């Protein structure tokens, strides 16, 4: 949805999508833009440093928006290593590429899961940007680790970064196991 929005709003921008197409990925969703001369799809993982550096050398991006993530809480409990690899190591690879190739802006798409859980009997409570990190699963811990790494790269190397901690993004093409499609189906 982000790619469609950006190509429509900024038709002169070059948009490159790097995606390893895990179980929730579906290349056919990009069919409407595959022939757009300002769009390129690359099937690789953000954990593959050589592939990421090669792509940066070929495309010379100005900015990076990192949507890449393993993002299912239950799956993170079954196999946390995959989450640590993609969400933390992959973020480190992207941050190193941003340093090496002089990226002017990096945006980390995170999750509200880094804040933990709110008590169900307290509807008056809510999260803010100042809420302390209080993770409750390997998934949320891996995303919090990535967020902290991004902030460390900003402080240590001066990289211009932003982080958003969204709650249950939804829209066309969303994988059916995610919250909103699951609620609609049930």
PLM region spans:
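Substrate-binding strand-loop-helix patch
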Residues: 170-177
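Short, intrinsically disordered, charge-balanced linker/junction segments flanking boundaries
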Residues: 183-186
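N-terminal Rossmann-like NAD(P)+-binding domain of SDR-like oxidoreductases, especially those catalyzing
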Residues: 1-169
